[in-house]
Amino acid sequence: MNNRGILIVLSGFSGAGKGTVVKNILKTYPDEYAVSVSATTRAPREGETDGREYFFKSTSEFQKMIATGELIEYAQYVGNYYGTPRRYVEEQLEAGKNIILEIEIQGAFNIKKMFPDAVLMFLMPPTAAELENRLRGRGTEDEATIKARLARATQEAEGVEAVSYTHLTL
């Protein structure tokens, strides 16, 4: 019997509700699921702690992780790098935990190549206006960042069909 965990990739536009979904899964099923903590070069938001929400890295530290093969996938998003550390994911799967990766479309495409059995889910808001409301409602980004995230969402929407996603609207 194989007790290896399932790799679940949750993607979606910034502001689609990925973080909320993940928090509810972990609250409801704490012994069955774990979330991968990504590395990033973006600055921490208020209340975020290194190693909990993200591993916050300098650009040079992140580039070293790329060069030494420490990341399963990585991508640049709105001027910052994001990536998934390999060791933690593999340890959780071997321990029988279902591991959730909250990553963008490009990363999901790369994960599916490396882990063909991974389950891919794409979370989207019901309308573009709702997405903008959610981004503004956070109160964590300036106008330029909100506009960049909305522009990126438009680009990502065009790439969703290239990956075998299950689509979820919240």
Mark where each language-model region is.
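ATP-dependent NMP and nucleoside kinases share a basic, alpha-helical "lid"
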Residues: 84-138
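Walker A/P-loop
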Residues: 19
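ATP-binding Walker
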Residues: 16
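P-loop (Walker A) phosphate-binding loop of NTP-binding proteins
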Residues: 13
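Conserved small/polar residues in nucleotide/adenosyl-binding loops
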Residues: 166-170
